[in-house]
Amino acid sequence: MDPYKNRPSSAFNSPFWTTNSGAPIWNNNSSLTVGSRGPILLEDYHLVEKLANFDRERIPERVVHARGASAKGFFEVTHDISHLTCADFLRAPGVQTPLIVRFSTVIHERGSPETLRDPRGFAVKFYTREGNFDLVGNNFPVFFVRDGLKFPDMVHALKPNPKSHIQENWRILDFFSHHPESLHMFSFLFDDVGIPQDYRHMDGFGVNTYTLINKAGKALYVKFHWKTTSGEKSLLDDEAIRVGGSNHSHATQDLYDSIAAGNYPEWKLYIQTLDPENEDRLDFDPLDVTKTWPEDVLPLQPVGRMVLNKNIDNFFAENEQLAFCPAIIVPGVYYSDDKLLQTRVFSYADTQRHRLGPNYLQLPANAPKCAHHNNHHDGFMNFMHRDEEVNYFPSRYDPVRHAEKVPVPPRILGGKREKCMIEKENNFKQPGERYRSWPSDRQERFVRRWVDALSDPRVTHEIRSIWISYWSQADRSLGQKIASHLNLKPSI
C-alpha cells in the first residue's frame, strides 16, 4: 500500500464521519453518558480525540509577520540575464517557475487590522528545478538597522509595552534615537507609502544585497525589485481609519477576491547589479541595508514577471505553515556579507523549527517540487515515507553522489576579528534627498506624523532634541519645521 495515496485530504473523503484513525462514527451529536442525563464516560474516545485536537489547533504565531495572506502563481523570465547568473530558473526568456507568495504586516498580531502604519512583508518562494529559492523581502527597499545583532531589541521596541501590551511611541523613539541609520526607513514608514492601499498595489524589494554568479564564476552584487503593474497606491491616515473600521481584513479579501474574479495581480522583477570591484566608488557601503542604490548610476534591469493566478486551498496549510528563509537559495544566487542578511540566514530557519517543528520543510507548502536526497531523517512529525537501508554517506551500496560543483563567489577574506561599525555610515544624505523629492503637501503630512509621534508625553526633551538634530542633518528645513511645531529650537 502506498501511504501517500491514502493520506487525509479533500480528494480522499469518506462519505461518513470517522475518527482520525478511520473508524466510523455513528453519532457526532451526543457524548457517551450513563443514561440520558448521566456523567460522560472517559471511554468516549471520539469525544476525547475531538477535544484534544481542538485544544491543539493553534500553533505559535510568527514573532514578526504574524498577520499575512498568501497566493500562488508563476514567474516567467522575460529578459535574458544568463550572462549574469547560472540560476536554472533564470536560464532563458519564456521559462516559467511555479511559486507561492506571502504578504504580511510586520509588527502586529495575527488578527490585527491591515490598515496600521507598518512595513509589509513581501516573501516569494520559487519552486525551481534546482530546489526552492526564497526571496524574503518587504515593501520598502531599506531597513531600520544594518546589523542583525540589534534585531531582537528593535522588535522589542516596536512591539507593545510588555507591561501594558500597548505599542507606544516613546519606546520606539527612545530605541531608534540611538540608531541614526534608521532615518531612511522612517522616511518610508512615516511617508504616505507607510500604509499601502492593499497588497496588490504595493511594490516589493529583496532589501538585502545578494550575489549573482554566472557560469564563469563572475560574481556581482545584486538588489531585487518587484514593481506592481497595478500601480502603487496608499491610504492616507483618515482613509486608513475609515477602511480599517469597516473591514480589518480588507487587504486579504482584496487579494482573494481579485484572483477569484480572474483579475490576476502581476509584478515585474528588476535587478540592480554592482561589480564588487567598483563598490568604493559609492559614498556608502553597498552592503548597508539602510541604503538604496541610485538608479541613475546602477539602473534597473528587467528580468521577468510574476503572476498570481490561484488562491490557496487552505489558510492554515498554505499560510500559517508556509515558512520562508533567506538561506534557501539555488545555484547562481548567493549571499553577501550584508550583516543583516548574515543573521537572517540563521534566524529564519531557527524560528520555523521552533514554530512548526524540525521537519517543517516536509510540509507540502515548503517542500521542494524537484527530487531531493539527504540523510536528514526522523525527529518530531517526520511523515516522509522512506525505505532505504543506507542512511549514511558515502556508501558502496548507495549510488548517490555529490552534485556537480557550482560557482560560488571567489572572494578572498582577511582582517582582524572585531566588533565594529562600518566605515561609510552616511546616515543622513539619502533620507534628506527623499524628503526633498516630495511635493510640499506630502512633506507637510510627513512633518505632521513626526510631530504627533514626538508629542507623546513620555518622550523626553532630550529624545525630541536628538530627533530634531537627526532630521536637521538630513534636511535643515525639515528639522526646523518639526522643531517649530514642537516649540523647540533646532540644535543645528
From Swiss-Prot:
Gene3D superfamilies: Catalase core domain. It comes from the Eukaryota. It catalyses: 2 H2O2 = O2 + 2 H2O. Disulfide bonds: none annotated. Its main location: cytoplasm. Transmembrane segments: none annotated. The keyword Transcription regulation does not apply. Heme binds at Y348. Belongs to the catalase family. It is found in: Cytoplasm, Cytosol; Peroxisome matrix. The active site is at H65, N138. Its EC number is 1.11.1.6. Its cofactor is heme. GO terms for molecular function: catalase activity; heme binding; metal ion binding. Homotetramer. Coiled coil: none annotated. InterPro entries: Catalase, Catalase_AS, Catalase_clade1/3, Catalase_core, Catalase_haem_BS, Catalase_immune_responsive, Catalase_sf. GO terms for cellular component: cytoplasm; cytosol; peroxisomal matrix; peroxisome; plasma membrane. One of its GO terms (biological process) is hydrogen peroxide catabolic process. The lineage of its organism: Eukaryota, Viridiplantae, Streptophyta, Embryophyta, Tracheophyta. Keywords: Cytoplasm, Heme, Hydrogen peroxide, Iron, Metal-binding, Oxidoreductase, Peroxidase, Peroxisome. Catalyzes the degradation of hydrogen peroxide (H(2)O(2)) generated by peroxisomal oxidases to water and oxygen, thereby protecting cells from the toxic effects of hydrogen peroxide. This is Catalase-1/2.
